[in-house]
């Protein structure tokens, strides 16, 4: 089980709020669809410029990029404790799809790192693992 999230519902609530906020800010700048297959706790998130869908809401939506990772790995990424290149090299994050598209998205996410810390405070989550 996750060090950060003690249950699946809290992890889903946190990431849905965080990504909704990001999508509202970035809007059409997000010209890619993402599918996150999250482990420990297990759930899926589909994200595009229209919003976020979780688990059964995803239906048959197809993503440009698919990520498989643990929720703790995602947490470490957003806290800037783990870079995406290192996570990929060590197989902490596995991807399917166009990696160059992902790398183009990273600069857009720069302001999100500070916001993630704000969400950690709001949800009383650790800011270090």
Describe the role of every protein-language-model region.
Residues 1-129:
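Feature captures hydrophobic
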